[in-house]
């Protein structure tokens, strides 16, 4: 699935209007119908609902939704904030104001000057339709005060498209008291880039994406740097069967350089994961102290003893290996850095750096210059910051891995709730299949193994 910037989303709307053709007000009605259906599945007609609509198209969505809710027996209290200079509304917002007025609904109030907020209780619902993703500046004045009031009310808050005050992409100066904190965000067609950043979760709450049937040709032809990988995408690309006359050598020979004294568990987990996920042969290069552990715990693996008793001192370079993975439990000292430097200058096979191999890069940045094209780095956020310095938020980290991937012609897999994969062509692919249960020791060793198993077997 493509993820578009705010600017590109405006283009999608405009081209859908042109290609279908459909009027902008009818496209807004389509969005309101999707919103109304989801709200009715979430909120009871007996629940008190307050709708706060801004002067732009986000407000138009809110007013159209209010009208459709009234048609379904709901009794929302609706406030339209027409407080911009010259009291100008967007054309579609103005048209939906007139449609709502014609219903004769008594609890519709247009605010043009001072506003005394209603008493909103914790059992009520607030529908936030003040500002959408097109907002360009942080909220100030009366709108900032209204946002604080909404957040302090304890009500169940539903934001239309995006919480008011939150920008669609980067939020470098996000202030908690100027952004609505929604419990549920109902967005359109595809998620906003901002939804993938951990620092914004407290604003978006649960997110649901509503299909408003933007023109498929428009989506297909509009370029983007951002993509979302779903479980369905992964399932379509998994090799489900093997030829009857298969040989283990058909599925790659992986060299795993991992482990040190007292840290062999990482090597065991990685080797087992590689074998379970389909690689034909696995050789584990570890210090000599690992012999009994590996031969017992992973009998299918070939043990490749290092000359070091307790630490890896060198990593073999041999054409028999179809891919090499380095780092789990390996340790990070001068000998490790030296072994990696020798390897990256000689190797031609696909290479994956994880864990302590990444920490070696943090110690010796020049390693990056010698990495073979399309080497895969698999840091979590702390490993990333050890390598490239402190970063305050996920948005900064995303920019960092994009820069690193394009500069060094490598792939960076930033592990997290929405794992971000930066490719050398500048694109970012988010993986939506993770879950909090993976936040445990060893899961990174297994996850990285799945990456290099793919490299070894292809």
Residue ranges: model-predicted function:
Residues 57-60, 86, 135, 164, ...:
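Phosphate/ribose-phosphate-bearing ligand recognition and processing surfaces
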Residues 456-458:
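Positively charged, low-complexity/disordered segments
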Residues 36-125, 129, 138-160:
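Nucleotide and nucleotide-moiety/phosphate-recognizing core
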Residues 125-139, 324-331:
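Glycine-rich phosphate-binding loop
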Residues 130-221:
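Internal gly/pro-rich beta-alpha loop/helix module
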């Amino acid at each position: 699935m493509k993820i578009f910037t705010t600017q590109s989303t405006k283009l999608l709307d405009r081209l859908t209007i042109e290609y279908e053709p459909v009027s902008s007000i009818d496209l807004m009605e389509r969005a309101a119908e999707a919103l109304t259906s989801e709200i009715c599945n979430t909120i009871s007609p007996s629940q008190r609902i307050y709708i706060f609509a801004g002067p732009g198209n986000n407000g138009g969505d809110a007013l159209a939704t209010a009208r459709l809710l009234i048609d379904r027996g709901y009794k929302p209290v609706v406030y339209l904030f027409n407080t911009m200079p010259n009291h100008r509304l967007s054309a579609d917002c103005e048209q939906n104001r007139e449609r709502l007025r014609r219903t004769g609904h008594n609890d519709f109030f247009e605010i043009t000057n001072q506003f005394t907020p209603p008493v909103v209780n914790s059992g009520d619902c607030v529908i936030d339709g003040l500002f959408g993703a097109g907002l360009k500046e942080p909220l100030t004045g009366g709108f900032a005060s209204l946002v604080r009031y909404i957040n302090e009310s304890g009500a169940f808050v539903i934001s239309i498209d995006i919480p008011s005050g939150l920008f669609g992409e980067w939020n470098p100066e996000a202030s908690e008291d100027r952004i609505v904190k929604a419990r549920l965000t109902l967005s359109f067609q595809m998620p906003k880039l901002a939804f993938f950043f951990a620092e914004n979760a407290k604003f978006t709450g649960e997110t649901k994406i509503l299909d408003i049937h933007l023109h498929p040709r428009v989506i297909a032809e509009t370029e983007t740097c951002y993509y979302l990988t779903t479980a369905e995408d992964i399932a379509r690309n998994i090799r489900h069967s093997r030829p009857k006359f298969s040989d283990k050598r058909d599925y790659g020979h992986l060299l795993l350089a991992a482990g040190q004294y007292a840290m062999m568990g990482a090597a065991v987990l990685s080797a087992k994961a590689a074998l379970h996920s389909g690689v034909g042969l696995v050789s584990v290069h570890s210090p000599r102290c690992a012999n009994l552990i590996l031969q017992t715990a992973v009998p299918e693996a070939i043990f490749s003893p290092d000359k070091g008793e307790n630490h890896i001192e060198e990593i073999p370079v041999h054409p028999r290996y179809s891919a090499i993975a380095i780092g789990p439990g390996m340790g990070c000292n001068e000998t490790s850095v030296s072994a990696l430097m020798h390897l990256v200058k000689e190797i031609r096979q696909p290479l994956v750096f994880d864990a302590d191999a990444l920490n070696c890069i943090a110690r010796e940045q020049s390693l990056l210059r010698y990495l073979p094209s399309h080497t895969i780095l698999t840091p979590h956020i702390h490993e990333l910051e050890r390598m490239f310095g402190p970063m305050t938020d996920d948005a900064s980290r995303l920019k960092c891995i994009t820069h690193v991937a394009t500069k060094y012609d490598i792939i960076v897999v930033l592990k997290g709730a929405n794992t971000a994969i930066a490719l050398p062509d500048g694109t970012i692919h988010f993986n939506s299949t993770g879950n909090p249960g993976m936040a445990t020791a060893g899961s990174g060793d297994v996850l990285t193994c799945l990456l290099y198993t793919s490299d070894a077997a292809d």
